[in-house]
Amino acid sequence: MDKYFPTLPDRVPARGNCLSRNIFKNLFLAQGWHFKGEFPNLPKAVAIISPHTSNIDAWYGFTALLGLGIKITIFGKHTLFKTPLKPLLNWIGVIPVQRNAQQGLTQQIINFINTQAQIWVGMAPEGTRKRAETIKSGFYRIAVGAHIPIVMFSFDYAHKTIHCLGVFQPTGDYEPDLEQILNLYIGKFSPKNPNWLARPLQNRIKK
């Protein structure tokens, strides 16, 4: 059985220590999962992972992230930080944003990215685990606005694999760029719940 698990490259933002990485790496591998693909050595990126069709995606995703020791930044509603969840959100790496701010959510995120020397922003482009009719453009607009690349990952439940699909530098022309991004997923993904697979991915799944 393939037990490949990458070592985090030196320019990628890191978290944790050797002990925590080994614990979560071994937990990830013990579940029969592994990685495929070369992990890019980039200080800044928007990282997307698809398909998102189940809550269990978060479990495999977070055990992989903690095993890698990568620091992924997620943005969430500022009101969540007024609840008992605040310590957990801070530990995960969630940054508060105001959805009704005048400058807009996307621009808030871009502005924050521009203050950081290293940052990987994590996003699920479907925006929901249930079947989405379209892929939300937020991840793309953030990458274009911050002038950073997109790194693509996929869940492949049939083979218990997380694929790293490579790096895509957006041109600013959304529709053709999205087609290229989605085409990189062909043959490299399978959802936990096929009935909830986003429509743009349905005709790209390997039969």
Region roles according to the model:
Residues 24-28, 50-52, 96-101, 128-130:
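Short, flexible loop segments at the rims of nucleotide/cofactor-binding pockets, characterized by
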Residues 38-100, 157:
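Catalytic core of membrane glycerolipid acyltransferases/transacylases, capturing the structured
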Residues 29, 66, 144:
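Anion (oxyanion) recognition and catalysis
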Residues 32-40, 61, 107-110, 137:
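A generic local structural motif
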Residues 2-11, 15, 19, 102-207:
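Non-catalytic C-terminal accessory region of glycerolipid acyltransferases
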